[in-house]
């Protein structure tokens, strides 16, 4: 069974892109909350 490189890349992007997007939003909200508390 051969591993399709394009399918592997597509799967990786499909997982990494939303994860990175959520991380960026999380970090932004965390920094804003810390600034508001101070």
UniProtKB/Swiss-Prot annotation:
For biological process, the GO terms are:
photosynthesis, light reaction
Q: Which UniProt keywords apply?
A: Chloroplast, Membrane, Photosynthesis, Photosystem II, Plastid, Reaction center, Thylakoid, Transmembrane, Transmembrane helix
- Entry's transmembrane regions: 5-25
Q: Which InterPro entries does this UniProt record tie to the protein? A: PSII_PsbM, PSII_PsbM_sf
Note whether Cell membrane occurs among the keywords. Answer: no
Recorded hits in Pfam families, A to Z, give: PsbM (PF05151)
Subcellular location per UniProt equals: Plastid, Chloroplast thylakoid membrane
Principal cellular location given in the protein's record:
plastid
Its placement in the membrane is given as: Single-pass membrane protein
- CC annotations in GO: chloroplast thylakoid membrane; photosystem II
**Superkingdom assignment:** Eukaryota
Q: SUPFAM superfamilies from the xrefs?
A: Photosystem II reaction center protein M, PsbM
| Record's keyword annotation contains Thylakoid | yes
Checking HAMAP family in the record gives: PSII_PsbM (MF_00438)
The entry assigns this protein to a family as follows:
Belongs to the PsbM family.
Q: What does this protein do?
A: One of the components of the core complex of photosystem II (PSII). PSII is a light-driven water:plastoquinone oxidoreductase that uses light energy to abstract electrons from H(2)O, generating O(2) and a proton gradient subsequently used for ATP formation. It consists of a core antenna complex that captures photons, and an electron transfer chain that converts photonic excitation into a charge separation. This subunit is found at the monomer-monomer interface.
The record describes its quaternary structure and partners as: PSII is composed of 1 copy each of membrane proteins PsbA, PsbB, PsbC, PsbD, PsbE, PsbF, PsbH, PsbI, PsbJ, PsbK, PsbL, PsbM, PsbT, PsbX, PsbY, PsbZ, Psb30/Ycf12, at least 3 peripheral proteins of the oxygen-evolving complex and a large number of cofactors. It forms dimeric complexes.
Identify the NCBIfam families for this entry: PS_II_psbM
- Its protein name is Photosystem II reaction center protein M
Q: Which organism is it from?
A: Daucus carota
